[in-house]
Amino acid sequence: AAVTCIFMTLFGLSLGFALLKVQGE
């Protein structure tokens, strides 16, 4: 459960950062 939570958090941050980078350009 803990590993899944961490994985989901990292995935969410990566996705959010990617979206911000795309909108920034």
Curated annotation (Swiss-Prot):
The chain crosses the membrane at residues 2-22. GO terms for cellular component: chloroplast thylakoid membrane; cytochrome b6f complex. It comes from the Eukaryota. One of its GO terms (biological process) is photosynthesis. Keywords: Chloroplast, Electron transport, Membrane, Photosynthesis, Plastid, Thylakoid, Transmembrane, Transmembrane helix, Transport. Its main location: plastid. It is found in: Plastid, Chloroplast thylakoid membrane. It is a single-pass membrane protein. It holds the Pfam family PetM. The keyword S-adenosyl-L-methionine does not apply. The keyword Chloroplast applies. Disulfide bonds: none annotated. The 4 large subunits of the cytochrome b6-f complex are cytochrome b6, subunit IV (17 kDa polypeptide, PetD), cytochrome f and the Rieske protein, while the 4 small subunits are PetG, PetL, PetM and PetN. The complex functions as a dimer. Component of the cytochrome b6-f complex, which mediates electron transfer between photosystem II (PSII) and photosystem I (PSI), cyclic electron flow around PSI, and state transitions. Belongs to the PetM family. This is Cytochrome b6-f complex subunit 7.
